[in-house]
Amino acid sequence: GFQEPELPQIEYLIKCLPEYVHFKQDREDGLRPNGQYLMIMWLKNKYELCDSGRFWLSPTPDEASFGWDGRCRRVTVWVKLRDKKSERTFYYFNTHLDHRGNEARQKGAEMNVKMMQRIAGKHAVIFHSGDMNSQRGTTTEAYLQPYDNWMKSARERAVESDQRATFDGFGKSQPRWLDHIFYRHAKAVKYATLDGKD
């Protein structure tokens, strides 16, 4: 799952990763052609797309809109994929919570859980990644609670994991752990933060 790529970056990824296919949605829904997107990519020889969709994190989720006290329009994209070998299906949701609005983060997280329950149901295998703009051990940890109540954290539950920060402003900011992966009805085998520093 990708948050914030713009069209030149998306075109680069598509060119460099021809074995993958993708589903994307710009958060402005075409209002700003050069704006930021949310995107999911998957191996086309391994998975088949069964369904896909998107919703905005706002009181009007079917249209590009600002949520509560959010600074930006925020959207969640999702796909339902079928493993071609095992024929098992799963859902993948990818989101980006607001970076300023506290109410927008709280209600955005609550809406994500509500929509996952509505779209996938309570018994499906679900993976959910995103820039949550929320960190454990700080006041923003409260915005992760809706996920904790219904899902498990891959970083905390994986057999093999790490504690590397997911954000450091390209070396210009204090390291922070703002990005998270949650899952349901699956097993976390490995969690790794790929920061290009190795």
What are these regions (language model features)?
Residues 17-22, 86-91, 121-126, 149-151:
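Loop/turn elements at helix/coil->beta-strand transitions in domains of secreted/extracellular proteins
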Residues 57-61, 98-99, 110-114, 147-149:
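Short, low-complexity, polar/charged sequence segments that are solvent-exposed and flexible
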Residues 1-13, 41, 79, 91-95, ...:
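Active-site beta-strand/loop signature of hydrolases that rely on acidic residues for catalysis
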Residues 47, 71-73, 80-106, 110, ...:
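Metal-dependent phosphoester/phosphodiester hydrolase catalytic core
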